[in-house]
């Protein structure tokens, strides 16, 4: 009869394929099980590493995509900035040119306004009265108007006789005294010049007496054309004379709107000329003769037909 210990030992024993029994508790320490666990652990580690590698690769791809996107965005922004800078530069250059041109135009406009407002509108309405007050010239004045000389070069002589020896100073009209700019009885006066045409050897000939003077603002344009900082070239200066004459004519003709007090119409004549080709005496007499011819033709047309 088998003992209890023998039976217990038999129950707790297991048999290997080779017939060698393995007791319970010794199974986990067998080489086969240990290797299996090692393989499983290694496989798990490999999977974890692969996941980590994939995640790292994904992160790097995301970072690379972000870099590419940023580069594209940066390039786009740079293009926009460059376009805006170019546009701004174009606008600034255009504005600058416009301002420069406008400034040059404003020179002519400003001079014309100043000449009209500060001088012509004050003296022209009084011109006929000053002529009538002159005992010396009241019956000699050829035309009761002020001839305003506008030389193309803007150069003005202190004495008109220096520009044309046939135009000689004969005297002044009575002065006008006007309160102006805080100055009491400021003096304004006009010079009368005599021209003898044609001058015979004995000095005789037909005498003309003109109230004539230079447009003094042209002296400013002349000085500007000689002053480097003014940046006014000779061709631009010549153009400014035309603009000055145009604006001055506009202002003088619109003086009719001043309720008669400053009406300058018919009391002036602007005389533009090229000093290299024209002589002042010839121009003045030609203007006078043409005006008389037109006047005579108008009178003939006004005579009723019998």
From Swiss-Prot:
According to its record, what are the GO cellular component terms?
Answer: autophagosome; endoplasmic reticulum membrane
Give the InterPro entries listed for this entry. STING, STING_C_sf, STING_LBD
Matching entries from Gene3D superfamilies are given as: 1.20.5.5200, Stimulator of interferon genes protein
Pfam families linked to this entry: STING_LBD
User: What keywords are assigned to this protein?
Assistant: Immunity, Innate immunity, Nucleotide-binding
Source domain of life: Eukaryota
Q: Does the keyword Nucleotide-binding apply?
A: yes
Q: Write out the ranges of the annotated region (Disordered).
A: 1-50
What residues bind 2',3'-cGAMP, as annotated? 119, 180, 186
Keyword Ubl conjugation set for record: no
Extract the GO molecular function terms from the UniProt entry. Answer: 2',3'-cyclic GMP-AMP binding; cyclic-di-GMP binding
> One of this protein's GO BP terms?
autophagosome assembly
Concerning its family, UniProt says: Belongs to the STING family.
- Give a short account of what the protein does: Facilitator of innate immune signaling that acts as a sensor of second messenger signals produced by cyclic GMP-AMP synthase-like receptors (cGLRs) and promotes the production of type I interferon. Innate immune response is triggered in response to nucleotides from viruses and bacteria delivered to the cytoplasm. Acts by binding cyclic dinucleotides: recognizes and binds 2'-3' linked cGAMP (2'-3'-cGAMP), a second messengers produced by cGLRs in response to nucleotides in the cytosol, such as double-stranded RNA (dsRNA).
Q: What is this protein called?
A: Stimulator of interferon genes protein 5
This chain's source organism reads: Stylophora pistillata (Smooth cauliflower coral)
| Lineage, top ranks | Eukaryota, Metazoa, Cnidaria, Anthozoa, Hexacorallia
| This protein's encoding gene | STING5
């Amino acid at each position: 009869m088998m003992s209890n210990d023998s039976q217990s030992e038999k129950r707790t024993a297991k048999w290997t394929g080779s017939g060698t029994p393995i007791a319970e508790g010794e199974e986990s320490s067998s080489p086969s099980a240990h290797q299996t666990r090692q393989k499983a652990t290694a496989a798990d580690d490999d999977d974890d590493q692969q996941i980590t590698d994939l995640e790292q690769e994904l992160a790097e791809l995301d970072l690379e995509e972000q870099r590419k996107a940023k580069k594209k965005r940066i390039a786009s922004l740079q293009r926009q900035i460059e376009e805006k800078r170019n546009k701004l530069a174009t606008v600034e250059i255009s504005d600058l040119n416009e301002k420069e041109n406008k400034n040059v135009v404003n020179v002519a406009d400003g001079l014309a306004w100043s000449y009209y407002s500060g001088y012509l509108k004050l003296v022209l309405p009084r011109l006929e009265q000053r002529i009538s007050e002159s005992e010396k010239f009241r019956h000699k004045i050829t035309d009761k108007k002020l001839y305003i000389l506008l030389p193309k070069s803007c150069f003005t002589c202190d004495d008109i006789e220096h520009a044309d020896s046939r135009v000689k100073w004969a005297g002044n009209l009575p002065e006008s005294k006007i309160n102006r700019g805080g100055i009491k009885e400021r003096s304004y006066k006009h010079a009368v010049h005599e021209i003898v045409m044609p001058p015979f050897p004995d000095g005789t000939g037909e005498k003309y007496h003109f109230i004539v003077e230079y447009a003094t603002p042209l002296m400013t344009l002349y000085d500007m054309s000689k002053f480097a900082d003014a940046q006014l070239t000779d061709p631009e200066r010549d153009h400014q004379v035309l603009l000055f004459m145009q604006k001055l004519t506009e202002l003088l003709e619109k003086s009719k709107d001043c309720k008669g007090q400053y009406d300058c119409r018919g009391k002036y004549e602007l005389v533009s000329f090229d000093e290299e080709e024209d002589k002042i005496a010839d121009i003045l007499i030609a203007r006078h003769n043409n005006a008389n011819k037109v006047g005579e033709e108008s009178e003939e047309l006004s005579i009723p037909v019998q």
